[in-house]
Amino acid sequence: MASISHSSLALGGASSASASDYLRSSSNGVNGVPLKTLGRAVFTTIRRKDLAVTSRLKKGKKFEHPWPANPDPNVKGGVLSYLAEFKPLGDTQKPVTLDFEKPLVELEKKIVDVRKMANETGLDFTEQIITLENKYRQALKDLYTHLTPIQRVNIARHPNRPTFLDHIHNITDKFMELHGDRAGYDDPAIVTGIGTIDGKRYMFIGHQKGRNTKENIMRNFGMPTPHGYRKALRMMYYADHHGFPIVTFIDTPGAYADLKSEELGQGEAIANNLRTMFGLKVPILSIVIGEGGSGGALAIGCANKMLMLENAVFYVASPEACAAILWKTSKAAPEAAEKLRITSKELVKLNVADGIIPEPLGGAHADPSWTSQQIKIAINENMNEFGKMSGEELLKHRMAKYRKIGVFIEGEPIEPSRKINMKKREAVFSDSRKLQGEVDKLKEQILKAKETSTEAEPSSEVLNEMIEKLKSEIDDEYTEAAIAVGLEERLTAMREEFSKASSEEHLMHPVLIEKIEKLKEEFNTRLTDAPNYESLKSKLNMLRDFSRAKAASEATSLKKEINKRFQEAVDRPEIREKVEAIKAEVASSGASSFDELPDALKEKVLKTKGEVEAEMAGVLKSMGLELDAVKQNQKDTAEQIYAANENLQEKLEKLNQEITSKIEEVVRTPEIKSMVELLKVETAKASKTPGVTEAYQKIEALEQQIKQKIAEALNTSGLQEKQDELEKELAAARELAAEESDGSVKEDDDDDEDSSESGKSEMVNPSFA
């Protein structure tokens, strides 16, 4: 035990000290004695035996803060690697569904219910369920690869989106949070600290939002005050002094804009940060992990490179604020978000951002660990690039990044990247409502299979309903395809022109028909480039199958009905008696074939046959059906006539050649030639001014004049007489063929007229007709 004796001080010359000297603070003296007096005093040591101070000294344990050089991996609780009050929440966060995600979430629940139902019933619907799951994944992929700007804003603001410290916890080996701006305040909205990634030490600075209401209040919803920016500035100086690369994480709606912050110098703090960051000689990398609002984000965002997560946004004013200013209502936020160009893809095009870090489908909150690893990869890659630069090169690199933003050359024409179809294609993706209908249909099939164990054939009403629904979906697919290939406006204009031309006042003109055919051909050619081509193709195939099934079902039903009606007609007493009498006479005659029957019996058989056929024809007419067999027989008869009489065929071909040569001769005359040229000019004018009635009327008048001139020339050339003679020969040959055919059904007067006209149309050149 060691003893230390108390020593006293004897003061000399104290009488010269003033009273005010003894009233000074202890910081200016020792034991109440002013330093000024101590400087003039004479010291003597007096030992007092009646007073002693004792203390017990022992060797203390030396601590290594914050981490030992060689930590024991088997220590209880594991090696501490994270020094901060923040702790991960794990899976305790309540799931939040955004408005545009609700249809897919409900669909996913239904697919789960269908799988559960199939397992309970023991029925095998594996293929259908797998198909639905694949379609669901494709719909999810289409949704998140074609998000609108306002949808990306909503994802960036998602309550469960991982925060700055969540990513730090996932990517750093060790991290120690540093507090305070050394001016009496520690803003929790900005978190700073030193951490290591793969053995390399970095200074991390970032905005920190809350993960629940309590944390949001503590973190002020990620909106920093001047104290927060001054804390970040202090850490930047610290990193620059020690040579630590700086990594900043941006996730704030903006700097806190209350009256107190303005009094404390919010603008000055942000401006000071901007000025200082341009002079730091260490690498600076900024990553936008959520939303970056105006100067509040830029105060820690002046970096050599700025990267953005796929669904992050960066703006000078929020879409709601912009809409309130320009459109006087926040409901125009979707349009404002599109006009502001605040998404990662747009900002990379504008050279504001330098790269995009991918996110999983569903956003960063769907898989925070995977997102953090992508951030870690991006940090390592960019820091390896910056590590090859000196301090001066880093300053030049940082300056060049911001100098190239917004650069354009006035007066110099720039070729567009796309010279054809400059209209931007609209995103087309799978409709979750259609997929939901398929899920409901499968669910009904499972329930039906559970009750009947066999899937019944759908009724005609169900089939018609499915076909109509499929036609409606195909119309929607065609509309989406037209929008995607950039033909929507032309199709709309063509529809209007067609509706005018098809009305009573307007006639359909060949010019319009030709334009329609050209547009149709162009649409069919470009249809394969549409994003929804495969979906449209599958639905067309499905419609074809349904139509065939419907036709087969109707044919079967019609066949049954016809057989039933025929049987009823044959079973009538008068018909049955005649048929039975004929059968008895034929049996008593002993003839083995029709040719061996007597002539009187033949006539009787043919007469009875005609009566039965007439009765059956009446049955068909009563059902609203017509007989095509007669017309087919007429066609076959004409072919037989041409085959039997080669001379008649030669005459017909020769007459056609004469008519063609005469028409060509007439067209080459100066009068007709000038009329044809005028017709071409009027047709060209009409194609440039669609919908003009006068142009079409003028074209029709010219066509009628040309046709009349050609008809007059043909009538005066003697070709009409040749045609009349040839028609007489054809009629005689037709009568002869009709007499030779046994048991043929005779045609009525109307059919004779039709066949005559048909013969003319087959015989005479179409241009002459």
UniProtKB/Swiss-Prot annotation:
<dbReference type="GO" id="GO:2001295">
    <property type="term" value="P:malonyl-CoA biosynthetic process"/>
</dbReference>
<keyword id="KW-0547">Nucleotide-binding</keyword>
<keyword id="KW-0443">Lipid metabolism</keyword>
<feature type="transit peptide" description="Chloroplast">
    <location>
        <begin position="1"/>
        <end position="54"/>
    </location>
</feature>
<feature type="compositionally biased region" description="Basic and acidic residues">
    <location>
        <begin position="721"/>
        <end position="732"/>
    </location>
</feature>
<keyword id="KW-0275">Fatty acid biosynthesis</keyword>
<feature type="modified residue" description="Phosphoserine">
    <location>
        <position position="741"/>
    </location>
</feature>
<dbReference type="InterPro" id="IPR001095">
    <property type="entry name" value="Acetyl_CoA_COase_a_su"/>
</dbReference>
<dbReference type="InterPro" id="IPR011763">
    <property type="entry name" value="COA_CT_C"/>
</dbReference>
<feature type="coiled-coil region">
    <location>
        <begin position="426"/>
        <end position="504"/>
    </location>
</feature>
<comment type="subunit">
    <text>Acetyl-CoA carboxylase is a heterohexamer composed of biotin carboxyl carrier protein, biotin carboxylase and two subunits each of ACCase subunit alpha and ACCase plastid-coded subunit beta (accD).</text>
</comment>
<keyword id="KW-0809">Transit peptide</keyword>
<keyword id="KW-0276">Fatty acid metabolism</keyword>
<dbReference type="Pfam" id="PF03255">
    <property type="entry name" value="ACCA"/>
</dbReference>
<protein>
    <recommendedName>
        <fullName>Acetyl-coenzyme A carboxylase carboxyl transferase subunit alpha, chloroplastic</fullName>
        <ecNumber>2.1.3.15</ecNumber>
    </recommendedName>
</protein>
<dbReference type="InterPro" id="IPR029045">
    <property type="entry name" value="ClpP/crotonase-like_dom_sf"/>
</dbReference>
<dbReference type="GO" id="GO:0009706">
    <property type="term" value="C:chloroplast inner membrane"/>
</dbReference>
<comment type="pathway">
    <text>Lipid metabolism; malonyl-CoA biosynthesis; malonyl-CoA from acetyl-CoA: step 1/1.</text>
</comment>
<feature type="compositionally biased region" description="Acidic residues">
    <location>
        <begin position="738"/>
        <end position="756"/>
    </location>
</feature>
<comment type="function">
    <text>Component of the acetyl coenzyme A carboxylase (ACC) complex. First, biotin carboxylase catalyzes the carboxylation of biotin on its carrier protein (BCCP) and then the CO(2) group is transferred by the carboxyltransferase to acetyl-CoA to form malonyl-CoA.</text>
</comment>
<dbReference type="GO" id="GO:0009941">
    <property type="term" value="C:chloroplast envelope"/>
</dbReference>
<keyword id="KW-0597">Phosphoprotein</keyword>
<keyword id="KW-0472">Membrane</keyword>
<keyword id="KW-1001">Plastid inner membrane</keyword>
<keyword id="KW-0175">Coiled coil</keyword>
<dbReference type="GO" id="GO:0009536">
    <property type="term" value="C:plastid"/>
</dbReference>
<dbReference type="GO" id="GO:0006633">
    <property type="term" value="P:fatty acid biosynthetic process"/>
</dbReference>
<dbReference type="GO" id="GO:0016743">
    <property type="term" value="F:carboxyl- or carbamoyltransferase activity"/>
</dbReference>
<feature type="coiled-coil region">
    <location>
        <begin position="631"/>
        <end position="744"/>
    </location>
</feature>
<dbReference type="GO" id="GO:0005524">
    <property type="term" value="F:ATP binding"/>
</dbReference>
<feature type="domain" description="CoA carboxyltransferase C-terminal">
    <location>
        <begin position="132"/>
        <end position="385"/>
    </location>
</feature>
<keyword id="KW-0934">Plastid</keyword>
<keyword id="KW-0808">Transferase</keyword>
<feature type="region of interest" description="Disordered">
    <location>
        <begin position="718"/>
        <end position="769"/>
    </location>
</feature>
<keyword id="KW-0444">Lipid biosynthesis</keyword>
<dbReference type="GO" id="GO:0003989">
    <property type="term" value="F:acetyl-CoA carboxylase activity"/>
</dbReference>
<dbReference type="GO" id="GO:0009507">
    <property type="term" value="C:chloroplast"/>
</dbReference>
<comment type="similarity">
    <text>Belongs to the AccA family.</text>
</comment>
<dbReference type="GO" id="GO:0009317">
    <property type="term" value="C:acetyl-CoA carboxylase complex"/>
</dbReference>
<keyword id="KW-0067">ATP-binding</keyword>
<keyword id="KW-0150">Chloroplast</keyword>
<dbReference type="GO" id="GO:0009570">
    <property type="term" value="C:chloroplast stroma"/>
</dbReference>
